[in-house]
Amino acid sequence: MTLDKKATLLDVKIYQASGDVGIDSHAFIMANGVKYDYIGSKQLPKGVFVKVPECGYVAATLRFKPMPESTTEFDFRETADNSGWNIYGVRLDGKRPQANIPQHLLQQALDKNSKLPSTDLNLGKTVVAVRLLGYKPEYKTTLDIIADNWFSPYRMPYEHDSISVDGTCQVSANAILPTVATIRVNRTEIPFLAVPNDTTTVTIDLPTLTLAATHLFANDANVKNYVWFEGKHAAIDTELQSVKTKIDVFGVTSFDDICGMTPLQYRDYVQQSYERLLTAINSNAAIGSATRTLAQSILSMNYASALFGFKNNISMAPMIAGKRGVPRADMSIDTVSYFKPLEKLAVLHSKNQRYYSYLRDFTSSLRRKYISADPLLDDIAVGKRLSRSFNRKRPLTEQQMAAAHDSIANDMVRELLFANNEDLKSQLASADNILAEVKKSANQNSTFSIIDIDPKMSAEQILPTITDRYKGKAVLIDLWNTWCMPCRAAMSAIRPLKEQMTDVVYVYIADASSPVGKWGEMIKAISGVHVRLTKEQADALAELYKFSGIPTYFVVNKEGKITYQKTSFPGVEKLKEQLMSAMQ
């Protein structure tokens, strides 16, 4: 940064994998309670989007109204409502933002000889108490707890109360076995061992975590330690942080690599990744035997799951990687030879498989051929089938309850299913009250509105019902959810376009997988028309219009006809081009 008498100059690098970037014309710097407006930039002129080059970032010098030369700290805010890029507490005195870490955590002595908890069934609540040091409500920090217990929605965050003003939040979830769960703060994932009838206390240094998530400081050794655990398994939880990138054999970046692969090429790729990661875990001297066993078990189960999922992963790779023209691979395989490596996978014949959060994935007939016989899997399979309605926010019917009594042999497995059912009922009752408050707020607000859609409305009727009221205008429909990070990133990129094309109607459609409380808070900062569907309606809409992911966009012309459809963000210029055409 340069503090000049005529302007404040801020040198920036904006990282993005692809597409276009721009700076909101309402951006400003805040220092000592005074606002300094954005003047412009040669590299990123107001209202202009710049394509991200192959290097993955755009470098620019942003000009703001002049700040006093005595300024030592400032906030960069792209929008006043915190919906854009926001960077808080930037220091100009050479010091880094710091939180006050309690002394007992800094002096914490961890037991390297900690033992893993038993894999015997033990039904109860797992409680997570989180404290964010250095937290301020205006930061709009997102916090999710992801803990799977077989009969909960797949990798979906648990609903929880808002983060308190002091940065604390507590959530409890039903649990029957110790498994690796995840705390997600903004985009940073923190794994920990969620154990039934146990409480884990987690303290997070938010300023340091935020620095560690940036390109500038990602490899800085001084920002590696930002989380402390307290509880019976604090040592294991702490050590997990050093191997958290080693326990998933198939990450998002892998989709680039596997585009166009045959099943055998894919198997070899996954196997090589597994062996490389396993070697890294085994050679990590910073972890004890318990953490090593846990990491080996989770990695091995993920490896097996990746092999079984070859068809889906290869098919989805081009879309996820954003590559066009990739020829479809022949998916036929010789099952016996293809899955032969699994015959030597020890975890499939060990109770350590129970540490795997997604053990329910191994209840299919194909996967059961390679895993030791266990009556527990039979009960999980029944519960999995009965709990499918939970994904659609529907409690069990009386008939389903009776089927559970008749078909699930293990009492604790049955009670876990029923406990999830009761939790869902409570959530729905609470959600109705929250939704009523959100609608009330929308009626009093001029920047966003809500359209009610009958939960029984068919997929064929949904889009026409929404767009018919806007005939004579072009409409951009954005299908998203609160948990979809690419969706949210795209919204930020589109914001300046919305300022330019004010005659367009912007419609945002989410479904019941978005916690209603979080959805209600987020839409306050997303100007436009908002719609909330049931999960069944969202699935039916995807089937009708033949798309399999989000974000998905529709452009509707003045006559109410869909003229453009795209899954994954196509870039600002493409949307602008399609909207201009729809306005003709």
Tell me the role of every PLM-derived stretch.
Residues 479-496:
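Conserved redox-active cysteine motifs that mediate thiol-disulfide chemistry
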Residues 123, 206-472:
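Oxidative protein folding and maturation machinery
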Residues 39-73, 78-81:
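Short, solvent-exposed, Trp/other aromatic-anchored flexible loops in extracytoplasmic proteins
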Residues 5-17:
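Short, well-ordered beta-strand segments enriched in hydrophobic/aromatic residues
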Residues 473-474, 491-510, 581-583:
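Conserved helix-turn-beta segment immediately C-terminal to the redox Cys motif
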Residues 536-580:
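Thiol/disulfide oxidoreductase modules built on the thioredoxin-like
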Residues 91-289:
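A non-transmembrane, solvent-exposed segment enriched in polar/low-complexity residues
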Residues 503-518, 525-538:
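Thiol-based oxidoreductase modules, predominantly thioredoxin-like and allied folds used
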